[in-house]
């Protein structure tokens, strides 16, 4: 349990969390999320919402990197790593009970998911922050999430 007796799960579509962030900052944040019991799901995506449940599809092939591994350097896109394992296509669906979902998706404003979930009344509370409401940087989305979390 994290703060307010809530379990926290972070879903990331990319193989690495915080790619492009300074290695020291990335290591520090991932270490403290792990220490606090935050569950990290990389190579995963939210595919649906149903009656208080989030439905996530996660790639579980052997090439998927360990999201808690911070000592392995993340190379830029233009530098090939011949030793990197190829990520396969083996996936599994995970249904997780949720009290609250916070979306921070992409870098192009797209609030369709927010309004669809609101119209369907999927969950009692839903908030529209980050790139879902306006295009910005990760830092801005993180600050918006912190302000929202403090207010909840």
Roles of regions detected by a PLM:
Residues 2-117:
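A Rossmann-like FAD-binding core segment of flavoenzymes
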